[in-house]
Amino acid sequence: YYILDKSSLRTVVSFKKDGTPDTKYGRIGQGPGEYVFPWDMDIDETGVYVLDTNSKKVIHYNESGNLIGERKIPFFADAIKRLKNGNFIFNITPDGTQIPSLIYTDSLMNPIWNSRPYQEGYVGGYTTCGIFRNSNLGLCFYRSPSDSLAILDENGKVQTFIVFDFLDKSVPQIAKIDYIAFNQNNHSIDYLHFVNNPISVTDSLWIGLIEDGHNQYTIIFNPFNNKCGAKKFTKTSSIYDIIEPIFSDNKGTIVSVISQELKNKCKDYELLPDTIINALNDGNRVLLINKFHFYRN
């Protein structure tokens, strides 16, 4: 497992599947192979790519954590993905103007194309994890609290869109453009939206977190027939529930994360193995792995 720790430490690490620490990638600093503010990463057979937003560069490590090289990029970006053809796609940090939201570069980080300009005045304001996420259908591109998700092909070109219809609970357009200002102006926040890029568990089964400003729900849905079910997170929720899904292998396995913060927020915490409780009490987080089983009549 590869994890970008977005706590104050902001480090990139990897673990074996049994939880054994494996490697740390880079460190805080200004030198080669060092980052100031790692914001996103991508992993494939060629290594680990870390996007350092503040320094406007991409650092490339091999699986063992050794530095391969780094490249400067001439823009601020929130997300990175290496494409099948060896080129890269970046989601650009919005600045209120109609700059492109997607910039494509060659393997040396030279811009070669762009698409999907932001709406005039768009500044975002809501941090989204997993802006680019792989699925069996293609590469999913999503920024919260938008009500649409773009599916890209292997070269990063838009194929189709999935629209999320929350009816009268949909986020107003003003909030989609500037979420921070929308909240600061004391507008109601009783609107539903995805917290992060939803996760494809199989071709037709997706999972994600939604919130309405007061409550959090785990939603399982089929985006192609509008069928869905949601479970509200309350003190009656079990620690073994899928509370914060973060990753799937797209074959029925979903990985979620739990932390010590859940101790007084849900039940069954004391039923965790002592080794897990001790690890959580020491400030660690734990990955919870769930497997969906599908039965045919």
Label each region the model flagged.
Residues 1-6, 46-52, 86-94, 133-150, ...:
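Short beta-strand elements that form the blades of beta-propeller/WD-repeat-like
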Residues 9-13, 55-59, 96-103, 146-151, ...:
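Structural motif
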Residues 11-15, 20-45:
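Blade-loop segments of beta-propeller domains
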Residues 26-34, 72-78, 117-123, 164-170, ...:
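Short coil/turn segments at the loop-to-beta-strand junctions that recur within blades
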Residues 35-39, 51-100, 112-121:
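Asp-box/WD-like beta-propeller blade repeats and closely related beta-sheet repeat scaffolds
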Residues 36-40, 75-83, 123-131, 193-197, ...:
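Repeated scaffold domains used in trafficking and secretory/extracellular systems
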Residues 100-153:
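Loop-centered beta-sheet repeat module
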Residues 160-190, 224-251, 258:
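Conserved blade-ending motifs and adjacent loop-strand segments that build the rim/top face
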